[in-house]
């Protein structure tokens, strides 16, 4: 830090505050401080608080989060317990800021009991576990559905293609894996140990959470959290207002005591002067966050750290560590600042003076009352007179007084039910003290022994007194009754933490792994940022791109340790092969495990989504019935999935089923599976073909193949299908394709039929091979292999017992991509043993070659090697590409001789609707209108690419999708588009050609 070259004290002394140098210094300092504040506001995240907050509430939230966020208190609407709601939003953002926010799957964050709609609307990379534990939870879910629908309708383009990521299962039952988690006021129903067990089930390492906190809960039966305007009270059960009067000792050591209590002790949180629903939670769960420190469970040890306690909210974090933990003494304290000015006084609780209870009274009030009571005590007076004196003083010290016309509270008002007993207890305490002092005085002067004792020197008196007290302990004076109790301002807990299970945790290796993984992920993020920056600079209008609708994760050399170990442990054979010294066998086994886990997660997600919809509509796991709010619920879900529907027991559907769609399974109280016409069940888009669970089971039952995998990586139209046709041998080969359309095309090319027995025997999809009986072959010919997961390809080879796989595909076209954004995909890319390239196309016309080269230059990162930079065409067609702008779908020239391609399902649906309006045959809009993804591998003479919207669509920026769209034709290609789309790769290249 730089220092000034002059002395400030001398400067002020010589020139005063009017001096030129002093003024300049003050101006400079003020300018620097103002600049720092402006920079903070620019950097800080803007957080809008809509709740109306008072002056004190505003100061509370600004003191807590004003330094971290740029808070905007808009004062828009009154809300129940507004400060608590505002703090909850800031707490959520604060806890999320503790973890990486890259958006990558490996940085997914779990939220136990949080609001899924908050994360959905803000675009957080979060999966919420939001169980329906009662009517309150269902009400919250219904309200979130309404809020989601309202916001989506106002800005549908922002949420196009996105779906909320949450489940309605308890946290311990959800199977989504993630390293990080948050719990914003979600631990009340789980307790410290319940949170640890949920973390273990999810493979979570670090959890950060918040909860309402008052240390006085360890002592009192009721209290107030003043900042939150919240009153808490212990009740015997959720349905009884009987107070828990357990003594303090029992409360601090209630592990054994709680086992013999008939009812659980609950804590009710009520917000003062607000007629809203309160919260009732188990005291044992709340207490665990105050008393517990560590918990060992299934090879992991979890420890809690209490980070910040502010405004009645405690922020804590739970960290899990694997392996052995040597014994260590863990010590922590809970402080009771609210009772530091109080003293405990025992008062009668029964007329026979057998039962007593302890009440709190201000130390100053008791001290002054007792002082006057001692000075005014006279054993000659009747006890009633002295009792009145004490009551008068006690009343004066705890009532409202008027001084110079101003009313003031003197002391603290005493409960009317305890007022008389407090005065009576002080009277008994005063009388007992006088009697004790009198006895002591009489004993001192009663005999010659006392006089002899008094004549001794002080050392002899001390020695003699110690000997007598040691030999005759019963001679010690002792009090028959103790009235005053000193209230401790803190409680200390000592716990010995140790765990002997598991192996020693290799922290050094873990650090190296995390560093390597972070570098790889950081490079991916840096490349994405650079690409977005380049797009932004290239466009006249600034536009920030969302993540692509479908993306292929970059494989890493090392699997995710947390997720992999959990899956590998379920299958010994593949687990053993992942540790094989033969590298390719280990890679294939790991890929098969990943593919099986991926298909299983797809199935679980489908079940979870359907169960969530079923529960939202009022269904449960016991009865086959739904409630009356069906239209509201299904209208909301229909905005994100047009295939959502209800089949009633009468046989009718709530919405018309799209033509050609047949649902193979449905969901009701009996779960997901085939349903009859007389059943009530619900469906969504995943119920048309639902074979993920079967694919996962079959894959796990196989072993990694040891045969050779060869890949022919050729450009579009290089003759891959022709090559398959020329080398196919029926006696030894089987042809496998990625999808049904490709299988039909290959069957027509080889057998001139798409449904003959011979064609269906030798040409099958990968799913068909895994799910059905099939003969063993020695060689597999795979078409469009890039659309397969590497684990699925290995499973097909293993199922067919093939010793060789010859795979054809284009690595730069659309590759396999995960349909579940929450799954950490790392082994999807094909790893061949042999690779050969083909850079000559026989399909694409001459003018397509420079267009694709230009697209590769613009879209691919610098330094990327692409075979399309040197590809050549043998086509005789020299000019084929044209484009034209259209105003709407009605101007699209629908011709049965052309093949129509769209980037999105929405544009495809619009074209199909237009074809139906024009009464075109069903075969036309079933076979001649496809999306780019569905068109991969297709070859047509005349192709038209249609874009009907000018709203943001990242698919037009991706090289792989644009490449497929531009290389399907042999003779002509026409691009028809509505409006100008920023970043449209095809339009830019066609315009420059």
Curated annotation (Swiss-Prot):
Q: How does it sit in the membrane?
A: Peripheral membrane protein
Record EC number: 3.6.4.-, 2.1.1.-
Identify the keywords attached in UniProt to this record, alphabetized. Answer: ATP-binding, Helicase, Host endoplasmic reticulum, Host membrane, Hydrolase, Membrane, Methyltransferase, Nucleotide-binding, Transferase
Whether Zinc counts among this entry's keywords is: no
Any one GO cellular component localisation term in the record: host cell endoplasmic reticulum membrane
This protein's assembly is summarised as: Interacts with RNA-directed RNA polymerase 2a.
Q: What is this protein called?
A: Replication protein 1a
């Amino acid at each position: 830090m730089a220092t000034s070259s002059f002395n400030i004290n001398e400067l002020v002394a010589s020139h005063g505050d009017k001096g030129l140098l002093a003024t300049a210094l003050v101006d400079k300092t003020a300018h620097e401080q103002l600049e720092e504040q402006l920079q903070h506001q620019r950097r800080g995240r803007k957080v809008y608080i809509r709740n109306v907050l008072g002056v004190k509430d505003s100061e509370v939230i600004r003191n807590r989060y004003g330094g971290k966020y740029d808070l905007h208190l808009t004062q828009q609407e009154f809300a129940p317990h507004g400060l608590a709601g505002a703090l909850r939003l800031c707490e959520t953002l604060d806890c999320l800021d503790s973890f990486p926010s890259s958006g990558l799957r490996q940085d997914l964050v779990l939220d136990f009991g949080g609001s899924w709609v908050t994360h959905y609307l803000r675009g957080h990379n979060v999966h919420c576990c939001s169980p329906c534990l009662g009517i309150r939870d269902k009400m919250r879910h219904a309200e979130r559905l309404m809020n989601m629908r309202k916001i989506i309708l106002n800005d549908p383009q922002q949420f196009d293609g996105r779906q909320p990521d949450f489940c309605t299962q308890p946290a311990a039952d959800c199977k989504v894996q993630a390293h990080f988690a948050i719990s914003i006021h979600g631990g009340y129903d789980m307790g410290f140990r319940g949170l640890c067990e949920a973390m273990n089930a999810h493979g979570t390492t670090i959890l950060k959470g918040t909860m309402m906190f008052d240390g006085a809960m360890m002592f009192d039966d009721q209290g107030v959290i003043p900042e939150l305007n919240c009153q808490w009270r212990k009740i015997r059960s959720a349905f009884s207002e009987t107070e828990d009067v357990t003594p303090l000792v029992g409360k601090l050591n209630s592990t054994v005591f709680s086992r013999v209590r008939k009812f659980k002790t609950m804590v009710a949180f009520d917000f003062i002067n607000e007629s809203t629903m309160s919260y009732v939670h188990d005291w044992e769960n709340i207490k665990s966050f105050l008393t517990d420190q560590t918990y060992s469970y299934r090879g992991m040890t979890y420890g809690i750290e209490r980070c910040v306690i502010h405004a009645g909210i405690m922020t804590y974090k739970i960290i899990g560590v694997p392996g052995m933990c040597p014994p260590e003494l863990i010590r922590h304290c809970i402080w009771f600042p609210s009772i530091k000015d109080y003293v405990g006084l025992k008062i009668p609780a029964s007329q026979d003076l057998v039962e007593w209870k302890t009440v709190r009274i201000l130390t100053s009030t008791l001290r002054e009352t007792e002082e006057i009571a001692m000075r005014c005590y006279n054993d000659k007076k009747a006890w009633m007179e002295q009792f009145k004196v004490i009551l008068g003083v006690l009343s004066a010290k705890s009532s409202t007084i008027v001084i110079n016309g101003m009313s003031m509270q003197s002391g603290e008002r005493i409960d009317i039910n305890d007022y008389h007993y407090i005065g009576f207890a002080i009277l008994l305490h005063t009388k007992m003290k006088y009697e004790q002092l009198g006895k002591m005085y009489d004993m001192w002067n009663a005999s010659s022994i006392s006089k002899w004792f008094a004549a001794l020197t002080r050392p002899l008196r001390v020695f003699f007194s110690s000997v007598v007290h040691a030999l005759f302990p019963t001679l010690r004076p002792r009090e028959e009754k103790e009235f005053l109790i000193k209230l401790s301002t803190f409680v200390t807990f000592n716990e010995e933490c140790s765990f002997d299970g598991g192996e020693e945790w290799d922290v050094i290796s873990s650090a190296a792994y995390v560093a390597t993984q972070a570098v790889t992920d950081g490079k991916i993020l840096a490349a994405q940022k650079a690409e977005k920056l380049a797009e932004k600079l290239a466009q006249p209008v600034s536009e920030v791109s969302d993540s692509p609708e479908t993306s292929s994760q970059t494989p890493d050399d090392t699997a995710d340790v947390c997720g992999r170990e959990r899956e590998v442990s379920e299958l010994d054979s593949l687990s053993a092969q992942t540790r094989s010294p033969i590298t390719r066998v280990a890679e294939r086994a790991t890929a098969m495990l990943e593919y099986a886990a991926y298909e299983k997660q797809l199935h679980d997600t489908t079940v979870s989504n359907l169960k969530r919809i079923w529960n939202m509509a009022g269904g449960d796991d016991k009865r086959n019935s739904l409630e009356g709010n069906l239209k509201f619920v299904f209208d909301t879900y229909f905005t994100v999935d047009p295939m959502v529907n209800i089949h009633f027991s009468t046989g009718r559907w709530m919405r018309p089923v799209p033509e050609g769609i047949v649902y193979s399974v449905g969901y009701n109280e009996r779960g997901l599976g085939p349903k009859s016409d007389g059943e009530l069940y619900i469906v969504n888009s995943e119920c048309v073909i639902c074979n993920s669970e079967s694919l996962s089971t079959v894959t796990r039952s196989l072993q990694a193949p040891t045969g050779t995998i060869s890949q022919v990586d050729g450009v579009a139209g290089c003759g891959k299908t022709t090559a398959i046709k020329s080398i196919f041998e029926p006696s030894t080969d089987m042809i496998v394709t990625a999808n049904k359309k490709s299988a039909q095309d290959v069957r027509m090319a080889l057998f001139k039929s798409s449904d003959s027995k011979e064609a269906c025997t030798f040409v099958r999809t990968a799913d068909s091979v895994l799910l059905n009986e099939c003969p063993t072959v020695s060689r597999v010919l795979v078409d469009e292999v890039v659309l397969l997961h590497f684990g699925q390809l290995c499973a097909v080879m293993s199922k067919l017992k093939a010793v060789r796989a010859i795979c054809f595909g284009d690595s730069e076209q659309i590759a396999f991509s995960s349909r579940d954004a929450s799954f950490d995909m790392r082994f999807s890319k094909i790893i061949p043993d042999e690779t050969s390239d083909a850079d000559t196309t026989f399909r694409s016309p001459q003018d397509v070659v420079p267009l694709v080269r230009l697209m590769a230059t613009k879209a691919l990162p610098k330094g990327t090697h692409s075979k399309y930079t040197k590809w050549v065409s043998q086509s005789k067609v020299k000019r084929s590409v044209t484009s034209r702008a259209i105003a709407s779908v009605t101007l699209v020239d629908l011709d049965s001789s052309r093949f129509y391609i769209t980037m999105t399902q929405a544009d495809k649906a619009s074209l199909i609707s237009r074809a139906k309006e024009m009464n075109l045959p069903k075969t036309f809009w079933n076979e001649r209108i496809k999306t780019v993804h569905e068109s991969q591998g297709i070859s047509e003479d005349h192709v038209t690419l249609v874009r009907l919207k000018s709203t943001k669509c990242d698919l037009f920026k991706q090289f792989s999708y644009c490449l497929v769209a531009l290389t399907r034709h042999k003779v002509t290609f026409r691009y028809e588009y509505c409006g100008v789309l920023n970043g449209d790769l095809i339009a830019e290249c066609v315009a420059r050609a």
